[in-house]
Swiss-Prot record:
Cofactor: Mg(2+); Mn(2+)
Name of the protein in question: DNA ligase
Active site: 115
Catalytic reaction equation(s): NAD(+) + (deoxyribonucleotide)n-3'-hydroxyl + 5'-phospho-(deoxyribonucleotide)m = (deoxyribonucleotide)n+m + AMP + beta-nicotinamide D-nucleotide
Amino acid sequence: MESIIQQINQLRTSLRHHEHQYHVLDAPEIPDAEYDRMMQQLRDLEAQHPELVTNDSPTQRVGAAPLDAFEQVKHEVPMLSLDNVFDEESYLAFDKRVHDRLKTAEPLTFCCELKLDGLAVSLLYENGELVRAATRGDGTTGENITANVRTIRAIPLRLHGDNVPRRVEVRGEVFMPQAGFEQLNEEARRKGGKVFANPRNAAAGSLRQLDPRITAKRPLTFFCYGVGLLDGGELPRSHIQCLMQFKAWGLPVSERVKLCTGSDQVIAFYRQIEQDRAGLGFDIDGVVIKVDDLVLQEQLGFVARAPRWATAFKFPAQEQITQVREVEFQVGRTGAITPVARLEPVQVAGVIVSNATLHNADEIERLGLRIGDTVIVRRAGDVIPQVVGVVMEQRPDDTKEITFPSQCPVCGSDIERVEGEAVARCTGGLFCAAQRKEALKHFVSRRALDVDGMGDKIIEQLVEKQYVENPADLFQLTAGKLTGLDRMGPKSAQNLIAALEKAKQTTFARFLYALGIREVGEATAANLAAHFRTLDNLRAADIETLKSVPDVGEVVAKHVMNFLSEEHNQKVIEELEKVVSWPEPQQIVVEEIDSPFAGKTVVLTGSLTILSRDEAKDRLTALGAKVSGSVSKKTHLVIAGEAAGSKLAKAQELGIKVIDEAEMIRLLGE
């Protein structure tokens, strides 16, 4: 079981990182296919071990969090993502699941549409007028991009017709046609400006401009594909008729939509679109297949992060052949050593590819890869390249073996690989400049100490100029030193000093999360903070005491122990304690609390609509409850919100009491 927990935790950590890179930073590091593989592997493991499912698992969420630069918008109806299938066998399995759940053997009618490769947005119309536009964000909260969306001429500022609902929120995709993308990049090259890697990145970057005048100059367009909120009106009872209604209101809808009855017609449509893909004039990465009857959609319902009545049938990644020139090794925040192949540049799906991730030593061994080999490079999801195979018959005589380093290429510290883990790591910790940069970026991030304005470029300069070696050094910075950085004037420097001053007041949970202890995410940091209450108590804890904390197992307990016992980390924490502070937590004496939650282990599952999850946790904890992320025999109560999944099923299986959010609110008020 320990190796399963370790594998699950490792997958969650990797997926969270790559979600942030893709959805928040628009800087993905791995192919979509690799992300999908990891997500499916995690889903499979959690299905086999439902007691290990936690609220903060990537399988229980849609996407990633919004940026701070824009006002946040809470979606009244969550914007869910779609599950994916990658071949005909997987699609037929989806088709069978739908038939089985509906208890019918008759062929079903599906509405098949293009899967656009852009940015999902929500458009809210009140009395026919566009009043708000928002990105998907994490599915619950997005970014208010109304001013930018109003500049997109394809989007009507007012709906047409007499039957417009009082309030209607439509969903669709903002994207950049290929011709406009090429023209934008050509102009950028002439001016020596930023060139975008692909149309999706260009669309995302254009929508996230703080100045709408810049967005207005970008060749963006939009297709509508669904509805979220509807108030004061009616829609047809089939999806394709809804699309026609959107079109009648003046909303753009793709012409490549088709009703298909039975799996043979669906697969034929998929193959036809795959064949026509290159001539569409805009990027797609598959076909979306939806049960057309809205009554049947309601019967099928949802799982935690996606509807049961729809799936995305994705195209195979596009591939080309090239040669490996060299292999270099990069170092991440936790010391993970990632081999990267430097390739003979080759055009794959319209983009010049010169680098590809090799993931780890096991992947190199699996491929049988050598320097000088001819390899197959795939751009999964048309975004990120990876080496998927070696063309052995083209191997030259002078290839070189790839030697995985035993010392860190940045700091020279030993590299170790823990038994059972695929990832090798530098043991240098914050002594390693590469780890220092990534650790500092994490320390100042929004969910950690939230130092507003302290971006990646600033961190990199601070480390390179040796102004900062560890997080404690950040609080010794002066405006004078900061003004010596690129693009840092006196006012910006003063603002950054003020942001650092503000960050000194935090919470124990945020502080623990900011330290960057392996496997300690926000939820685990909050549990550790609630359990130990002070740093001294946490320092004094042994493995068994740590394991008594909700969601902390053997692996996480060892990571915490190792981090706190390392001499360099101890010194950094001591320095931080001199400047960073948080409110002294009040001692909660459970026996003195008159509450139905006192002394109970409580699990929250599904989407809450009245309170946010954080608010619910805070109020439950204040009334003496221990809030856990997983259901076990020790759980006393499960609070089930909308679209509750495996945790609810586990609770019912174990005979644990289940209440809904309304009942929780009533009990909180007693």
